[in-house]
Amino acid sequence: MNARLLYVRKYPWIILLLLVAMVLSGTAYAQQRTVKGTVTAGDEPMPGVNVLLKGTSIGAVTDIDGNYSINIPEEGGTLVFSMIGFQSIEEEIGNRSEISPVLNEDIAGLEEVVVVGYGTQVKRNITGSIASADLSRSSDDINVTEAMVGVPGVQFNETGRPGQVGNLLIRGQNSLSGSNSPLIVLDGIIFSGNLNDISPRDIKSMEVLKDASSTAIYGSRAANGVILITSKGGTTETPSISVNTYTGISDWASELKLLSPERYVQRRLDWRAQSGLDADPDLIGNYLSTTEAENLQNGNSINPWDEIAQQGRSSSVDLNISGRTKATNYFLSASLSDDKGLVYDDNQKRSTFRANITSTIKPWLQIGTNTMFSHRDLSGISASVRDAYRTSPLGTMYYEDGSPTQFPVPDEQAAGNPMRTSLISDNEEIRENLFSNFFATVDAPFLEGLSYRVNFSPSFQWNHAYNFVHQDKNVSFNNTSASKLNERQYNWVLENILTYTKRLGENHNFDVTLLLGRNHVEAESTTATGEQFNVDVLGFNNLGLGEIQRTNSAAYSVDMVSYMARVNYQFKNRYMLTLTARKDGSSVFSVNNKYATFPSGSLAWIVTDEEFMRNLAFLDMLKLRVSYGAVGNQAIEPYQSLTLSSTQRYVFGDGGPSSLGVVTATLGNDDLTWETTKTANFAVDFEFFQRRIAGTIEYYNSNTENLLVRRNIPVMNGYTSILTNVGEVNNRGLELSLTTDNIRKEQFQWTTDFTFSHNKNEIVHLFKTDLNGDGQEDDNIANSWFIGKPINSYYDYEFDGIYQEGDEDIPAGSQPGFVRVKDLNGDGVINPDDRTVVGSGNIPKYQFGLRNNLRYQNFSLSIFINAMQGWIAPFNLINPLVPGRSLNQLDAGWWTSENQSNNRPSLVYSNPLQTNWYMSRDFIRLRDVTFSYDFDQQLLDKLKLNGLKLYVTGKNLGTITDWLGTDPENGGSYTSEQGSDNLYPIPKTFLVGLNVSF
């Protein structure tokens, strides 16, 4: 069947909705008239000015001569003339048929306000490296982490699993053993929850702080960058109600190609032939296990992927009510979402609630709260992807009564039934988060510009995971077991913030911010297990029924105190200076290094404000920025600087019962100190041709010193290792963001956003030892740490093809079809000395993002493509390893004398060198396509609505890659129960949604 026709038949509802939108777009207009004119600035015509009928989507754009023409309803209204860099003008139409306004240049130029941490700044005055995630140009269903894709310097690797946030990095990896995740700040308060706790529809803005100048205000927590999330507030004087809902389905974007029964049989025959054994196709039943032979004879087979798959589905409803009065600003929201993954029993249900309220008690006093509660239900044990790709297509998944087998091929037991654990288990996993901030702001009546704000932010997290494994009636032993895990965390933040803003004459502006803060965290967890239940009716609700019982518990607390000062200064509104210093103290370090100070400074110069630049008509804005500073990373768990004890049993004398005693377990280190990252940043911001082209180029160079690493020590000391500060890691790179306004027409607009990021990560120093005396610092092969190479590089033999029949250089012990590796030292012998760093896979060398936004009348289309280039990862499924058994059923091909592949080994190759098989993870992906329609104002008036938008979104629609797994994005960055060769699919998703406001 024609592929396009098949698509229409499979998703007819999408086509129907598009037809409905087009029909409604033709709703009869009331009687109209035309208004025209010319827009100027001074004596010059102004092309590209937006002309909009206020309160509607009716608009036009001035041509190259500044002329416009717009059709409006007979009753008239108000025209709004706007353009970046100029003050907007509103003109009442009345009976006029011609309106020619004169725009005045916005003196501030870039008046966009950006959240910078402990306050806001006009974008023009920013001196540090801050990037914004443009939520308005993303699909309405997008989650919080996906909004970061395409932000220069930000790397996000998706997992494809419901409820999982994936891996998020800003400008590479800084720490060898500590966390490399960025700090999350929600509404000005450090957020310790999961990003999936936050409803995307509650977010007003997201900023990414990347250099030391912008992150130093967060001191010891900011070495990996900072993401600032600001939630919404009320914007209209009358109450506004908004509803967003969507529903959609997901499917496999790329399914792992497994052996068909025919290919499975052929592989067994080829293996026997290559092994010198009989390989008669008529006797294949003798070469298979009993189960496989019976299924082959009876024509029974399975596709393990089909067995574990479920139809992916997504649905969500968001409701918010907002508004403002003279005394109160409020935003109230609730959301419900239900996501089913592509693998059986892998799901998430989420509900969130938010209340943002600010009240003006007196002209000088405001109080308020930002409170959020989330409830996430992750119950269920997903089917095993790992067992699925190991399962023979001739195996048996279920007995005749429908109960799951323990092993699809019982004779071999090489792979468990991927569905068994899911089907015989009850699982409940709930995660809840209550995050709040109560604040008061006082504007000093005795000194203009002085204000004081106090934040008190208590937050609670409750997690529990309960599991019960029922008796499998097909096994002869008692396999029942149960476990209950309960976790609780309480966290409070108290901040006192003093700000002072002052203007001195015409040329001097400055503001000062001072902070005194405290942070307390306490957490505890309890685990109880039971085994061998004779009664399983109560499941995990009565662990006392188990014959074997165990309990375990843990608790910790951390305290921090912080002091911060920041000064922003502008001279003539073109020279900017920012100085910041923060001092942090933490209980995780001993008394010797409990405190650390992190300073930074930055400068900016708006070159185009200089007199000598005024005659460059094509250049609208040129700004230079430079910054340098230091930030920190605690990077260790509580109590790691102390000498810790543990219990151990010992038998005295010649025997008898053991006694429980206390022994020292780890060696403390009073000199442990903070990891420190020092970063230099250089940037150029530019705008050309009346802001039709705008962008930023940045170069950064950061060094992280005093890395917290556990180092091996001689066992004669009584310990095997000690936590120390050693080594240095460098990250340097280049970032580009470019926005072009390609077409500005009355009925059609087209803009493009392009981003590029390059990061080079390398280890500069480790332990500064030279044990072999070769004059070079020693690497740490055990941890894959190599001087001059990226963190977690791959150290292995270098693949050089496959030995073929007729080759004259086949060494002893090898044969045609075996792997050839390079003799790097040229001694004629392949041994461990021939290993080298073959690549790295955590961070791509290059990232690209390209988004095109097109609008025709009320229709909008957004297309986003992203790419990651320059990284590899092991993909060991290429080698069957044990082809004589039902292990690893990837159909990647294999070497035979009839088909002499140069990149796949023969079936008898046993990989004696234990070489990994590496593949490129490079990809180019059509990540997001969104088509939307904004209904006409006249229809909205009839329905008494403020807004109505219908949209259709397709995500992960196509990927160009050589990666043989399900997806290269999560190919090496995520470790789960499926193993290091992660094969969990990132879904292809189609959504249809509706936004309604009234």
Write out the residue ranges for each language-model feature.
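Short, acidic, small-residue-rich periplasmic hinge/interaction motif at the N-terminus
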Residues: 36-55, 78-87, 94-138, 171, ...
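Short acidic/polar hinge/loop motifs at secondary-structure boundaries
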Residues: 68-71, 146, 182, 187-216
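Residues embedded in well-ordered regular secondary structure
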Residues: 129-132, 137-140, 150-157, 161-169, ...
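Conserved small-residue
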Residues: 242-296, 724, 741-842, 962
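Flexible loop and strand-edge segments within Gram-negative outer membrane beta-barrel domains
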Residues: 252-254, 295-335, 339-346, 352-433, ...
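Surface-exposed loop/turn segments flanking beta-strands in extracellular/periplasmic regions
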Residues: 262-300, 387-420, 467-482, 524-551, ...
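Small-side-chain secondary-structure face that scaffolds active or pore-lining regions
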Residues: 341-352, 372-387, 432-433, 439-534, ...
